[in-house]
């Protein structure tokens, strides 16, 4: 088994880590940062940008820059939360043929797992660059309150990215792993309060020493998969829009460029107000009318921000209360409170959490990195590198089937430790009924229609019998990823039917395979592009150094040599403008060949007269410190 990386696939930012020599290493990306924005952009020339490069161009390309796509994963287009998001994002959310929420970019419909796969590919590449070897296996985290469809969709994203997802692990559980691995032995109970970019989770976790093993047992979990930092940003954006309208009489709502600038400004202001009591948002030329350009200048205080979002923070308290009740734990028995997710840096969040739990949250856990670190530890456990850790997670929501009268009958209650298997015997509702439909549901409501439908299947060819006589045994089996397998068996005939719940939404196997193939094609294109860029850079460097050498050599170069080198230079410069790597490499070879005699002459002369060579060498060293940069003209589209 190879190295198993841990990936925190976040709504706003993502992070990757690995266990090395007993320590967890959070891996820096190519830009030198430990977290990567979960943003994907599709450029006009077909290039796919991920992370910081996508974020940088968002203002000029709002319709094709996708962010917070995790909020759509495993969701139906008609869900109220999706409809609310449609009003708030500049990109297009559309209805897929199966009713799922997809996005549309440049006229092409794309599934959220397909887009999330681009972020996972970036995380995979980050790990591969650091380790110097191919990575094919990962543990990926999801919000604890993700339902079965959302977990399946996350696993699909991993497959599309070329990863074998060894385990889906809940984010708060991962954070507890990161926190508890190096703590003193002994039993203690912790609360993990995880308020991220798009989701909120709270888990009650007991960390115990059992026969020399660290045992992490999740006692209860609760949350809201549509509450996070993005919602805080939206409140600020709305405030800025209202203030601007009061002053100018103009609404910015219909202007995607202005809204994208506002989004970035809101995020920046929110972060600044965690450490300052006041900040100013200054966006010149935000829009224009007949009287000329308009500028947005708004001062906002921390107290104003808190008044805008206080109800959002309050919404996190009820799930905390429910989780404690479900765990059967008194609030006074909590030893530590761990804050996870960037939004927990907000002073108001910390204040309310401290007030509710009656104790200060720990400050020694990095809220942006703890989840990825825990995922890496779980990866090491699965790989056999860590042997003294046992993780007992739970199913976050009740699972059951629809029975007569539209009632949901539970088979596996919420907060049941997984993996688990439960069976129950049901019967027919009518005389001589020859088939039953097993309708699998997830949720806490008694009325079947009020819960999330995970899928349906039929058990047919039941022998004729009066109602209530046939015995149909339904078995629910949840694996360690929290993914459900359901079976139904006629006990009289032994006939059985079983499925892995793929949900009545989600991607088909054919769709996933096609996306995997597309990703492989893109990967090959990316590799070719990198190789071409490398060849161009090598060619550019050789052109520069050769021209400098000719200038330094002066009259020591014969006319014949100069002509040959000039011809090779022109040929290489022309090749660099083209797209053929082999041609560039051939022209590099040619130029190297014709310029080699001149280089040898210069070297021999320097060897004879080292003092004369010292000055140019110093100048060359200075010049070599200069980093080349490429600039692209930004055209105003008016």
UniProtKB/Swiss-Prot annotation:
Region (Disordered): 605-625
UniProt keyword list: ATP-binding, Chaperone, Nucleotide-binding, Phosphoprotein, Stress response
Bias type Basic and acidic residues, positions: 616-625
Modified residues (Phosphothreonine): 199
Organism domain of life: Bacteria
Keyword Phosphoprotein recorded: yes
Induction of the gene: By stress conditions e.g. heat shock.
Molecular-function GO terms, alphabetical: ATP binding; ATP-dependent protein folding chaperone; unfolded protein binding
Skewed-composition ranges (Low complexity): 605-615
InterPro entries from the UniProt entry: ATPase_NBD, Chaperone_DnaK, Heat_shock_70_CS, HSP70_C_sf, HSP70_peptide-bd_sf, Hsp_70_fam
Cross-referenced CDD domains: ASKHA_NBD_HSP70_DnaK-like
UniProt keyword Nucleotide-binding present: yes
Function text: Acts as a chaperone.
Family named by the database record: Belongs to the heat shock protein 70 family.
Protein name stated in the entry: Chaperone protein DnaK
Originating organism: Pseudomonas syringae pv. tomato (strain ATCC BAA-871 / DC3000)
